[in-house]
Amino acid sequence: MTQLKLPDIAAQTQAYAVPLNWVGMCGIALPVQFEGRTAAAKVDAGVSLVDGSSRGIHMSRLYLALGSLEHQPLTPLAIRQLLEDFLSSHASLSSAAYLRFSFEHLLNRPALISPLAGWKSYAVTVDTRIENEVFHVELSVSVPYSSTCPCSAALARQLIQQQFQTHFSEQKIEKAAVLQWLGSAEGIVATPHSQRSTAQVQVRLNSNQQVLPITELIDRIEASLGTAVQTAVKRADEQAFALANGQNLMFCEDAARRLHQALRQIEWSKAFKLRVEHAESLHAHDAVATSQWQWDVSCAV
């Protein structure tokens, strides 16, 4: 029996020669090792196609090369070596290589007062590339928090003052009566509106960074805002959460400025951009603010 040679269509030349910026695959399932645990990641892998006369790239080479990450921690060095493998397997075809990892990062978070704890999931994206022989790593996280409107809080306080004047207008005020009134539904006639909000932060890491500081970045974001959403709670925790919201009243502009200031203190970052979104409970639309530092492109909404 004559054995036929399998055709290699990708090796054929292309009559209409046009280089392509990015060619590859999106949504590849891959287990990645991070902080001693395995995360189920979706990976986008690709290279540039600078040889416009070439029909295409060797996608199977990229896919198989990803296997090198299954049994080692996900670090900038490991990713850089993989990107260099992409380029060496596409010599004369490609000058740039790209990898994006998207996964959920689980953190066990303690309650504010009680001994309870629970898991929170944070969306994480790691964007990496080699372009012009320079390696870049950008780390993105999405962090939920609570925001209470300062204007609404002021209006609520005014209504409570008016109610106080009405209730105690014609009697001698005694401390016990005031305390009882303040603890009643009649006394606190209004509350400010608050909502679950989201901070989306993208940080460009220094070239000598040896680890992906995902947990540290999340911790800094939550600390700067002061109102991280909770997991398991008892009444004491809920009360502490109410206090935290009252002490951290925020418009979206306030949240964006807090984050900007906190991110400027990070020593392993050389650029960042951020977007905060308050899913308004008063309105049917969202309030949004963005900021950036040392970023190449304007930070659009």
Swiss-Prot record:
Gene3D superfamilies: Urate Oxidase
InterPro entries: GTP_cyclohydrolase_FolE2, GTP_cyclohydrolase_FolE2/MptA
Biological process annotations from GO: tetrahydrofolate biosynthetic process
Pathway in which the depicted protein is active: Cofactor biosynthesis; 7,8-dihydroneopterin triphosphate biosynthesis; 7,8-dihydroneopterin triphosphate from GTP: step 1/1
Keywords per UniProt: Hydrolase
Site for May be catalytically important, residues: C149
One of the Pfam families matching this protein, by short name: GCHY-1
GO MF, one annotated term: GTP cyclohydrolase I activity
Enzyme class: hydrolase
Record protein name field: GTP cyclohydrolase FolE2
Source organism: Pseudomonas putida (strain GB-1)
Lineage: Bacteria, Pseudomonadati, Pseudomonadota, Gammaproteobacteria, Pseudomonadales
